């Protein structure tokens, strides 16, 4: 009898201790959770440290802290909204870690209600800003970062997301370095040869360039010894006369160092050749026709205007560095138009050290009618004519040349016409391909893989849900039964 009492006393003692320990664990967990919530602490236990900044970023930010550098980092969304979405958690954690450094002044705003701040960061409305975008400002240098560049989502054949890659750290740290260095790449509009004016004809396009983080300026080569060092590209828009020998020498020197040139060569009825520009194009195996392209199929041109024609985007090889120039536009099923254009072709006998590709071509019902030039030429028929193309020279430090047969589609008048938007986007893509404004810090992207269970039908799904619901209940019942049995034993 005494032994049984002792046994019951021992069971009660152990049960009491167990209950006390359980209560203590719950109390401690609640207190710790409250502390962590108040301090907004977090531990990154992901395999690839997806929610932590890497050594490259932290070392660079530490250096800026020591130098006393200050960057205003505007986020066009409230941090609480970013935090609440699982899809943007990596971005939220990155922004929080950036903000821990003295050099970063993180300012999150609601772009729809904070008009004063929006006016401050975009006073002339040059930037097209959307919710989720970011703007970095350091001194007089400003850079826009589209929010949709932070992630890349990969889907399966059924459109289901299978993985998500966070690209944000490399982009954001590179953008910080860009504004700290105070370097803004510039698109220079060549002048002095009757070209269309950046200030008079391309005011909206200049704003588009700013939106892509380029500056836009005019350049008269006769006033300088060489092309400026901040040149991302030289743009020549519809010159009415050839460039001089001296101008050609300066452009040659620029291209030999890996420069970028874009020629928008609208048809010109003048009875002369663009001798020096032709020579530059020939070095890239591009031959310019002295013609005006017209469409003979009435269903392929604007009613009453056979020189405003429907044309075709050319799909580039998937392993080409320039594949993205046309792929996204083609995938959207967009139909391009071009107006009053001349044509070009490649000299295939001289393309050995070059990478060349057509970007925009006509249908084979179009013709090239002779127009201008020092010599009589024949009409070009029964051929798909090239209206835009590019060439990259391996012997000139990867210098790039892009040609378009018209300069009007970018001007203030035509930019309002939706028919030319595809050509405009294509042209902007060539600029980004020639000179990417993003500074690559060499920081790897971080991936998240979504696990999923494939079930054959709804009945299987219901059965699985019942199992998931019943299993914990069964475990609890068994546990209680064991406890009761031990208590009464």
Model-predicted regions and their roles:
Residues 2-489:
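Short, surface-exposed patches at the edges or C-terminal ends of soluble domains, predominantly
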């Amino acid at each position: 009898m005494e032994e049984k009492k002792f046994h019951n006393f021992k069971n009660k003692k152990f049960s009491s201790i167990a209950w006390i320990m359980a209560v203590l664990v719950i109390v401690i967990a609640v207190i710790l959770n409250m502390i962590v919530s108040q301090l907004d602490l977090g531990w990154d236990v992901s395999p690839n440290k997806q929610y932590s900044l890497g050594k490259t970023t932290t070392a660079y930010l530490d250096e800026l802290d020591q130098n006393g550098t200050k960057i205003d980092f505007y986020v066009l969304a409230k941090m609480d909204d970013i935090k609440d979405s699982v899809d943007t958690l990596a971005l939220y954690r990155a922004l929080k870690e950036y903000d821990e450094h003295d050099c970063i002044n993180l300012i999150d705003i609601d772009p729809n209600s904070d008009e004063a701040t929006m006016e401050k960061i975009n006073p002339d409305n040059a930037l097209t800003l959307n919710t989720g975008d970011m703007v970095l400002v350091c001194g007089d240098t400003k850079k826009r970062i589209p929010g949709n560049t932070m992630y890349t989502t990969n889907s399966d054949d059924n459109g289901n997301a299978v993985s998500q890659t966070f690209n944000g750290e490399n982009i954001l740290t590179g953008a910080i370095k860009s504004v700290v260095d105070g370097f803004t790449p510039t698109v220079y509009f060549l002048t002095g040869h009757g070209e269309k004016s950046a200030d008079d004809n391309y005011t909206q396009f200049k704003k588009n360039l700013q939106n892509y983080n380029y500056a836009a300026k005019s350049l008269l080569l006769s006033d300088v010894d060489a092309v400026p060092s901040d040149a991302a590209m030289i743009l020549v828009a519809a010159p009415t006369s050839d460039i001089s020998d001296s101008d050609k020498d300066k452009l040659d020197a620029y291209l030999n160092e890996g420069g970028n040139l874009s020629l928008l060569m609208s048809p010109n009825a003048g009875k002369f050749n663009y001798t020096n520009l032709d020579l530059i194009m020939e070095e890239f195996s591009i031959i310019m026709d002295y013609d005006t392209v017209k469409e003979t199929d009435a269903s392929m041109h604007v009613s009453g205007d056979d020189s405003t024609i429907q044309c075709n985007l050319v799909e580039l090889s998937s392993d080409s560095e320039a594949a993205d120039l046309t792929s996204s536009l083609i995938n959207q099923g967009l139909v391009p138009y071009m107006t009053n254009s001349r044509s070009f072709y490649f000299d295939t006998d001289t393309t050995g050290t070059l990478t060349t590709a057509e970007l925009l071509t006509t249908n084979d019902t179009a013709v090239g009618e002779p127009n201008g030039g020092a010599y009589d030429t024949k009409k070009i028929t029964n051929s798909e004519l090239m209206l835009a193309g590019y060439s990259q020279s391996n012997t000139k430090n990867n210098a790039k040349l892009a040609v378009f047969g018209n300069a009007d589609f970018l001007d203030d008048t035509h930019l309002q016409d939706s028919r030319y938007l595809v050509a405009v986007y294509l042209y902007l893509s060539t600029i980004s391909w020639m000179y990417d404004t993003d500074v690559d810090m060499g920081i790897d992207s971080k991936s998240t893989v979504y696990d999923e269970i494939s079930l054959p039908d709804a009945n299987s799904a219901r059965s699985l849900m019942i199992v998931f619901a019943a299993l914990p209940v069964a475990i609890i019942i068994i546990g209680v039964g064991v406890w009761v049995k031990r208590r009464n034993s």
